[in-house]
């Protein structure tokens, strides 16, 4: 856990980043929170001349490549997971996930890479989340997994994280997780195709043999 080292950092000299006028009230608070965290806890500066960095919630690249946007005790494993997921990506393509503290792309790696070390403990966590004593074991956890088109969901989308597990009755289940931070969340509109698919019990081709599919939509607040 990070600890605020007040005596070791000049908190009275916090640079004041520019205010992004297009931010919502929540996003403005989240941006300030992350900017303060960057300075007071991570001890990292920002680039006042950068198009995004001027607002304070964007890491300098030299800090970003050290994993400052991630859970640092697991940074080597998280870095390995990111490189495996995006093996052919250029630096500019990975910059948002490494440097942007307001996006949600880095959050699944922070949450679920540590879980991959202990599937037994992970099974207990997910059992509690779905409020059932149903998970015998976790089989796999896939972050930002995009299956082939024929195996995608009916609306062509996929999940930020997919957890494959064995039910206590021996059948196979899946938990789909969509994570949001400052991005707008998904609203299930009455009468929409998504609502009808859920009510009619439709699933994608890859999930037709699965006994249970639970979608967990998590909003990660900054406080």
Q: Where do the PLM segments sit?
A:
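Short, well-structured alpha-helical interface segments that form or flank functional binding sites
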Residues: 102, 106, 110, 153-157, ...
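"Short basic amphipathic alpha-helical interaction patches in structured regions
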Residues: 125-129, 178-180, 189-196
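Active-site beta-strand-loop-beta-strand hairpin of nuclease catalytic cores
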Residues: 164-176
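Acidic, metal/cofactor-coordinating or nucleic-acid-engaging core segments within structured domains
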Residues: 185-223
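Short, solvent-exposed loop/turn segments at secondary-structure junctions
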Residues: 146-150, 168, 180-184
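Hydrophobic/aromatic-lined pockets within catalytic cores
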Residues: 116-120, 166, 181, 185
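Short acidic loop-to-beta-strand element that houses the catalytic metal-binding Asp/Glu
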Residues: 156-166
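Nuclease-adjacent, charged terminal/linker segments that flank catalytic cores
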Residues: 1-151
